[in-house]
């Protein structure tokens, strides 16, 4: 007996639904939605990167002591997926902790170039960012590591606390989450993450590099000499008398 096309059975309806392409939008079943995750390649790639940042152990001054404190149980930076490495070929993050000298600059650039892409840099401490207390009269300190390699996050302080390093890691993870695979060939500094717009007031520099020309450098003050029983040079006594006459 041939099937009646006017009254199709349930089996025929199911078979027809499987063969024909329905005009309506296909519905995702509950089983499929619970077992399949829909995402993009960029999101998956960035998630894998930001969850396993491997920093290179690089320290040249006292700031590295604060970074070494993160390895202990009090701060435990392993919960961020940070695994310290001693080889630049196994690291994708370098934290420049300490002063960078002219002699160390070529070695730092070589370490950065040996790191595989994608790679990131965190400048930790005032000496790394601007030269710090060595920026006024030092002939060997580099005034900013960003003159050598591109920097993603800056951590000011002398030295910064371990909590500040965690804050920098979180900001770097947010920066990594917004990247795209198409930008891997771009070496310029893009997509920097700024947390706060600071309203800084420009003031005159305290260290102008002219303190060697001050009179107290050539001879101590007269009060100090008298208190310590130091002999007062005649030239200094004459100059002080002239200053008193000019004032009077």
From Swiss-Prot:
SUPFAM superfamilies in the record: HydA/Nqo6-like
Its record classes its membrane topology as: Peripheral membrane protein
What's in the keyword line of the UniProt record? Answer: 4Fe-4S, Iron, Iron-sulfur, Membrane, Metal-binding, NAD, NADP, Plastoquinone, Quinone, Thylakoid, Translocase, Transport
Q: What is its EC number?
A: 7.1.1.-
Similarity section: Belongs to the complex I 20 kDa subunit family.
Asked if Thylakoid is a keyword of the record, the answer is yes
Cellular component annotations (GO), alphabetically ordered: plasma membrane-derived thylakoid membrane; respiratory chain complex I
Q: Which GO terms describe its molecular function?
A: 4 iron, 4 sulfur cluster binding; iron ion binding; NADH dehydrogenase (ubiquinone) activity; quinone binding
Chief location of this protein within or outside the cell: membrane
Q: Which residues form the propeptide?
A: 1-2
Q: Where in the cell is it found?
A: Cellular thylakoid membrane
Q: What is this protein called?
A: NAD(P)H-quinone oxidoreductase subunit K 1
Q: In what ranges is there compositional bias, type Polar residues?
A: 236-248
Q: Which cofactor does it need?
A: [4Fe-4S] cluster
Q: Name one Pfam family in it.
A: Oxidored_q6
Q: Which organism is it from?
A: Synechocystis sp. (strain ATCC 27184 / PCC 6803 / Kazusa)
Q: Which residues bind [4Fe-4S] cluster?
A: 62-63, 127, 158
User: Region annotation Disordered: residue ranges?
Assistant: 228-248
Write down how the cofactor binds this protein. Answer: Binds 1 [4Fe-4S] cluster.
Reaction(s) catalysed by this chain, per the record, are: a plastoquinone + NADH + (n+1) H(+)(in) = a plastoquinol + NAD(+) + n H(+)(out); a plastoquinone + NADPH + (n+1) H(+)(in) = a plastoquinol + NADP(+) + n H(+)(out)
Q: Which GO terms describe its biological process?
A: aerobic respiration; electron transport coupled proton transport; photosynthesis, light reaction
Assembly information from the UniProt record: NDH-1 can be composed of about 15 different subunits; different subcomplexes with different compositions have been identified which probably have different functions.
User: Highest taxon of the source?
Assistant: Bacteria
Which InterPro entries would you find in this protein's record?
A: NADH_UbQ_OxRdtase-like_20kDa, NADH_UQ_OxRdtase_20Kd_su
> Its function?
NDH-1 shuttles electrons from an unknown electron donor, via FMN and iron-sulfur (Fe-S) centers, to quinones in the respiratory and/or the photosynthetic chain. The immediate electron acceptor for the enzyme in this species is believed to be plastoquinone. Couples the redox reaction to proton translocation, and thus conserves the redox energy in a proton gradient. Cyanobacterial NDH-1 also plays a role in inorganic carbon-concentration.
């Amino acid at each position: 007996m041939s099937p009646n096309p006017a009254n199709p059975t349930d089996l025929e309806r199911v078979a027809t639904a499987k063969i024909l392409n329905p005009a309506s939008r296909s519905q995702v079943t509950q089983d499929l939605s619970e077992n399949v995750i829909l995402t993009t390649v960029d999101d998956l790639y960035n998630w894998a990167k930001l969850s396993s940042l491997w920093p290179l152990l690089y320290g040249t001054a006292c700031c590295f002591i604060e970074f070494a404190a993160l390895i202990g149980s009090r701060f435990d930076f392993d919960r961020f997926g940070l695994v310290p490495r001693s080889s630049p070929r196994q690291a994708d993050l370098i934290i420049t902790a300490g002063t960078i000298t002219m002699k160390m600059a070529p070695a730092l650039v070589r370490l950065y170039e040996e790191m595989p892409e994608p790679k990131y840099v965190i400048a930790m401490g005032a000496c790394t960012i601007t030269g710090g207390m060595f920026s006024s009269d030092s002939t060997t300190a580099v005034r900013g590591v960003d003159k050598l390699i591109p920097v993603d996050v800056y951590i000011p302080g002398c030295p910064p606390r371990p909590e500040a390093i965690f804050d920098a890691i979180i900001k770097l993870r947010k920066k990594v989450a917004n990247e795209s695979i198409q930008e891997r060939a771009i070496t310029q500094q893009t997509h920097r993450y700024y947390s706060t717009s600071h309203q800084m007031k420009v003031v005159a520099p305290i260290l102008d590099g002219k303190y060697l020309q001050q009179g107290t450098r050539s001879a101590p003050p007269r009060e100090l000499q008298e208190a310590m029983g130091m002999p007062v040079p005649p030239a200094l006594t004459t100059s002080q008398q002239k200053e008193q006459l000019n004032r009077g």
